[in-house]
A protein has these predicted regions:
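Short, positively charged and aromatic/hydrophobic N-terminal segments
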Residues: 2-3, 7-9, 16-26
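Acidic, glycine-enriched active-site microenvironments
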Residues: 30, 40, 44, 48, ...
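Glycine-rich oxoanion-binding loops at beta->alpha junctions
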Residues: 73-98, 383-418
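Mixed-charge interfacial surface used for oligomerization/domain docking
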Residues: 145-149, 161-164, 168-299, 333, ...
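A generic structural motif
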Residues: 298-307
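N-terminal glycine-rich anion-binding loop in soluble enzyme alpha/beta folds
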Residues: 347-405, 409
Length: 632
């Protein structure tokens, strides 16, 4: 028997110490052992195989939700495994490193089930510097139970069915064969057979003519490991040959009805002491369905479909420290896969204030800003609303802070959109106010490729004014304008946009330090109500000062009257911080002057609420292109 090129095989004599021997000494009394380095190599090659087939997995993603993101989710987890896994002193410790990385990087239903399988594998293996292939096979078989137990309602014909077949076949082969590549190949052939059966086990797969995407992802993982065993080539030199018939991946026409009971695919990772996985799973069932809970007593990776992600997180914040959270809009994902209005995707951040109806109708993709309060991270407009945040901050003098979307969050959405669109236009909050623009620009440069254009536009605005620019950009896309023409138009529109914010309480300005305590007391005593705007570069400045709400309204009226002497207002909106009545009063005044109602009235983001304070109302407008040179 010959060693593989990567020298992955070691042998040991039964009931003796572990040591290597030469090929000529091999006989039936010897069997295989695996080291920490070798098991890590297997997993890294398997991970690369999944990443290489991300697009195929997205294309066949039908169950449980036809959102076309299984490939992206699994690829994201595999990248985390590649980047964070480490070789340790024992095989068990190495597998724990892999499992921890998987829990951190897991995305989606399949990702979390896969992560729990890896957790089960790490917990089932013996803690030694090497293990036999029989011991590895036994641990793989036991790991399947962990995967099953993590799911609320296990369904056959999915990833778990293929995992079970892999574990069973590996056990059988390990007792009858001595060459590790032959053992893996035997088990892989049975895994392929189980994969093909998924096409008939689930009606939705049979109708679509595809195998289960998650099951295919696991099969690719095994195939990558097997390729390494048989060839031993480095990843850069590998030419991976698919062994599964291409007919399994015939293009499909999604026919999802969009009538799912729950809209948001909600995920998180919590850490703590004595976490009870079964208790989490039972409680989470009351918030939605598709519940998957993976992990151990130290950490838990959670997946659930729900309409109330804020309620889910309110419960989970009590169970441990929130390390990671992610919420996907399945309605939006289904729209992307089946009902794209254009091949140009439109993205903005959650500081842009827009009604959900416009966001849905215009297929606008939102990247949510992180809100930090008392060591807890919230997702703006998803896991917390402005009113709730202000109510919390009233309890003490701690003012919530915000954090721009991180590079990984941005990369995930742009990478996902690249699977379905030809180009992306991103409109960000003023880069003077946030690092969002710079983060998007850096990620866009990283993801640059010939057939996928990404343009990042600094709106130099925020809140309602940013919302108007996003709405206008969506209209340009709907008209069928080219990518470059749209970018040029929007950049010109930014100079014709304006926001005026009535700050009706100075409490948050005092808490933040923008106004000293002494000056704040004086300003509050005389009833000062400043009007804040953004200058030409997007920096916040004071536009005027009034001494009552009525006085502030009068100043806004005068501002609009002055503007309309030389300009025409194309459209305007009004946004507010928990002050619907105040917004309606201002709307009535503006309609009388401008001659038409606002295009919408809506609540602000939590970010704006923290800055402007309770009851703030903002008027934003966009002028027509017939603008004189006079400044406004």
């Amino acid at each position: 028997m010959n060693n593989t090129k990567c020298d992955i095989i070691k042998r040991e004599r039964r009931n003796s110490n572990y040591y290597s021997i030469s090929d000529t000494e091999y006989n039936g009394g010897w069997f295989i052992v695996i080291t920490s380095r070798q098991v890590l190599d297997l997993f890294l090659h398997g991970a690369h195989k999944v990443i290489d087939n991300k697009e195929m997995l997205n294309r066949i993603n039908v169950f449980p939700v036809q959102d076309g993101d299984t490939g992206s989710n699994l690829a994201s987890m595999m990248r985390t495994i590649i980047h964070q896994s480490e070789e340790k002193e024992t095989v068990k410790a190495t597998l724990e490193s892999v499992a921890d990385a998987a829990l951190y990087g897991a995305r989606g239903n399949s990702g979390i089930i896969f992560a729990q399988y890896l957790t089960g594998l790490s917990e089932s293996v013996i803690d030694r510097d090497t293990i036999s292939i029989q011991e590895y096979a036994q641990a793989s078989n036991l790991a399947v139970k962990y995967a099953y137990e993590s799911i609320e309602n296990p369904v056959e014909g999915t990833m778990i069915s293929v995992m079970r077949e892999w574990g069973t076949a590996l056990m059988h082969a390990a007792t009858n064969k001595d060459v590790i590549s032959e053992i893996f190949e035997y088990a892989f052939e049975h895994t392929q057979s189980a994969l093909k059966k998924t096409k008939e086990q689930l009606e939705v797969l049979r109708k679509a003519g595809v195998v289960d995407s998650g099951a295919q992802g696991f099969t690719f993982f095994v195939e990558g490991a097997l390729y390494f065993l048989k060839n031993g080539a480095s990843l850069d030199q590998s030419i991976i040959i698919d062994t599964i018939n291409d007919t399994l991946f015939t293009p499909i026409e999604m026919n999802h009805t969009g009538e799912d009971e729950y809209r948001y695919c909600t995920e998180c990772l919590i850490e703590g002491i004595g976490i009870e996985q079964h208790v989490l799973k039972e409680t989470l069932k009351t918030f939605g369905d598709s519940v998957v809970v993976a992990g151990n007593t130290r950490k838990s990776r959670i997946h659930i479909h729900t309409n109330e992600p804020a309620q889910v997180f309110e419960y989970l914040y009590q169970q441990g420290s929130m390390v990671f959270q992610k919420i996907d809009d399945m309605f939006k994902q289904e729209t992307v896969v089946n009902h794209r209005k254009s091949q140009i995707a439109l993205v903005t951040d959650s500081i842009a204030d827009l009604p959900q109806e416009i966001i849905d109708d215009e297929q606008i993709h939102i990247v949510h800003i992180d809100i930090l309060y008392k060591n807890i991270s919230y997702k703006d407009k998803l896991t917390i609303r402005a009113k709730t945040l202000l109510d919390l901050s009233k309890e003490d003098n701690v003012l919530p802070t915000s954090s721009q979307p991180g590079p990984k969050q941005i990369e995930n959405i742009l990478d996902y959109l690249s699977s379905y669109y030809d180009s992306v236009i991103v409109l960000t909050v003023s880069k003077v106010l946030s690092g969002t623009y710079n983060n998007f620009s850096k990620v866009a440069e990283k993801l640059k490729k010939p057939n996928f254009k990404i343009s990042i536009v600094n709106t130099k605005q925020n809140s309602g004014a940013q919302g108007l620019l996003v709405k206008k950009c969506a209209e340009y896309i709907s008209k069928g304008m080219t990518h470059d023409d749209i970018v040029d138009k929007i950049q010109a529109d930014t100079a014709r946009s304006k926001i005026l914010v009535q700050v009706l309480t100075l409490d948050n300005m005092i808490k933040s330090g923008r106004l000293s305590l002494r000056a704040g007391k004086i300003a509050k005593f005389i009833g000062m109500t400043p009007i804040i705007t953004l200058d030409e570069e997007g920096q916040g400045v004071i536009d005027g000062i009034a001494f009552s709400t009525e006085g502030s309204n009068k100043k806004l009226v005068k501002h609009i009257q002055k503007i309309m002497k030389n300009h025409k207002i194309a459209e305007y909106n009004i946004v507010h911080v928990n002050n619907e009545d105040g917004a309606k009063r201002l709307s009535d005044k503006m309609e009388t002057i401008i001659g038409k109602p606002p295009v919408y009235i809506t609540e602000t983001s939590s970010v704006i609420a923290v800055s402007a304070g309770e009851s703030a109302v903002a008027l934003s407008y966009l002028l027509t292109e017939e603008v004189s040179n006079e400044s406004f």
